[in-house]
Design a protein with these regions (language model features):
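Intrinsically disordered, low-complexity non-transmembrane regions of multi-pass membrane transporters
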Residues: 1-32, 237-261, 297-302, 446
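Membrane-embedded alpha-helical modules
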Residues: 115-233, 354-446
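Generic transmembrane alpha-helix signature in multi-pass membrane proteins
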Residues: 48-52, 60, 109-118, 141, ...
Length: 446
């Protein structure tokens, strides 16, 4: 039986923002959609920058040019928007019909770098592996009814908690200024991050009605404004708008994303590269299963349905294959946006569709994407720490519903002892194995 949140309605109303179906006036839908985009924008582009800056070309051993990397960032926005549309409004059995945002996954970084930096495979071999791996995961999703019985409630709860735990350092890294930056932990990063978090909390209490759930967007705007003030006043270099000018020089104001088959870097399909990445797609499937479960339990107040699991994983896989066709990296459901959905209870698909369309629009106008990308990491960190914690909270609520017996104790204990423990070891636990094994498991609690 469908809950009141899921009733089939076609009307336009502000109250629909808390319902799955129906439309919301654009003056409300666009800000809430934009909030989702800002929550994931930098994380969506960062993996592309990391991998594509290091990759070599199989054809000549050279690196991708700056203009080519900019075009791939453009493609990352485009495919994330397309993948989100498929999740929101399924085509046949492909899509969950749930408020899920898709984006480029960090999970694949290690394995993709192994392939992309191998001169015998290079960028072309990496793209071929992404296409094949995406198709593989898509069919794994479509066959979910055959293996769903092994995914018990306690396992699902552990996966959701693990996702939340794995994101906690991501939020704190951002608050500190971003992982690997020279001025990490500088006072101005901490001040701007704290200011952003305080604005988020205060606006959630002060604003009334649906507007209180725009607290993350309000925090982003005020935090960004403070970062600009610090930059203009010469206090700290937190915002750099030079990327906008550089983007216009390299790809222009308007540009259509290109299929990789129409470039000089056509994909190469290598069986070894596929096997390197296939197991990571299974890990990604576990993450998406946990994220989809968190949406259903945390936002809709019910268990995950088989057709939703099947459709969600199918999009996870097939949209990754589409991403590969544009020369980009695999997609997955974005956990920070799952946290935003469960925290605000804004589940309306039309509203989140506005976010997907903003992503697609930003891909067609690269300077717009460059503007979003200028958002300081500290501002994002201040906004996301609470969202990431809310994912872990939903997992704990799911675990509370499980029967606490010896079997549950063993599953939970071993899941976190091994899963989380591996991410905390002082060295490479899998040093005796091929490097790809360590790349997959050492830094991934899920």
């Amino acid at each position: 039986m469908e809950s009141n949140k899921e009733e089939k309605i076609t009307s336009v109303s502000e109250e629909n923002i808390y319902k799955l179906n129906g439309r919301v006036p654009l003056r409300k839908a666009i800000p809430f959609g934009l909030q989702h985009v800002l929550a994931m924008f930098v994380s969506n582009l960062a993996p592309v920058l990391i991998v594509c800056s290091a990759t070599v070309l199989r054809s000549n051993g050279a690196h991708l040019s700056s203009a080519e990397i900019t075009q791939l960032l453009q493609c990352a926005m485009f495919v994330a928007g397309i993948g989100t549309c498929l999740q929101l409004y399924p085509i046949g059995v492909i899509g969950s019909g749930l408020p899920i945002i898709m984006g480029v996954s960090f999970t694949f970084l290690g394995s993709l770098l192994v392939i992309a930096t191998n001169p015998d495979l290079g960028y072309e071999g990496m793209v071929g592996a992404v296409i094949l791996g995406g198709i593989f995961e898509g069919f794994v999703g479509l066959s979910a009814k055959y293996w769903r019985k092994y995914l018990t409630p306690v396992v699902s709860a552990c996966v959701v908690i693990a996702i939340g735990l794995s994101l906690l350092p991501v939020g704190m890294d951002s608050w500190g200024g971003g992982s690997g930056v020279k001025d990490f932990g500088s006072w101005y990063h901490l001040v701007v991050g704290a200011f952003t978090l305080i604005v988020c909390l205060v606006s959630r209490e002060v604003l009334k009605g649906v507007y209180k759930n725009l607290n993350v967007l309000v925090g982003l705007v005020f935090g960004y404004a403070l970062a600009i003030i610090f930059t203009v006043a010469g206090i700290a270099p937190m915002v750099d708008f030079s990327g906008i000018h550089k983007t216009i020089q390299e790809v222009g104001v308007f540009s259509i994303p290109k299929l990789v088959f129409l470039t000089s870097h056509k994909p190469v399909f290598n069986l070894g590269a596929f096997f390197t990445i296939a197991i990571v797609f299974l890990v990604s499937a576990a993450e998406t299963t946990g994220a989809t479960t968190a949406v259903c339990t945390g936002a809709l107040g019910r268990d995950l349905k088989m057709k939703e699991l099947r459709g969600s994983l199918a999009v996870d896989g097939f949209s990754s294959a589409i991403s590969g066709c544009f020369g980009c990296l695999p997609l997955t459901s974005f956990s920070q946006n799952i946290g935003l959905v469960t925290m605000t209870q804004v589940i309306n698909r039309f509203t989140i569709l506005m976010g997907a369309l903003i992503l697609i629009l930003a891909s067609l106008f690269p300077p717009l994407g460059a503007f979003f990308n200028s958002l300081p990491q500290a501002v994002l960190g201040g906004c996301t720490v609470m969202m990431f914690g809310s994912i872990m909270y939903e997992g704990i609520k799911m675990l509370k519903e499980c029967k606490f017996d010896d079997r549950t104790m063993i599953i939970v204990s071993l899941s976190f002892s091994i899963g989380v423990g591996l991410t905390q070891t002082s060295g490479n636990f899998f040093a005796a194995f091929p490097s790809a094994v360590g790349d997959v498991f050492n830094g991934n609690a899920v």
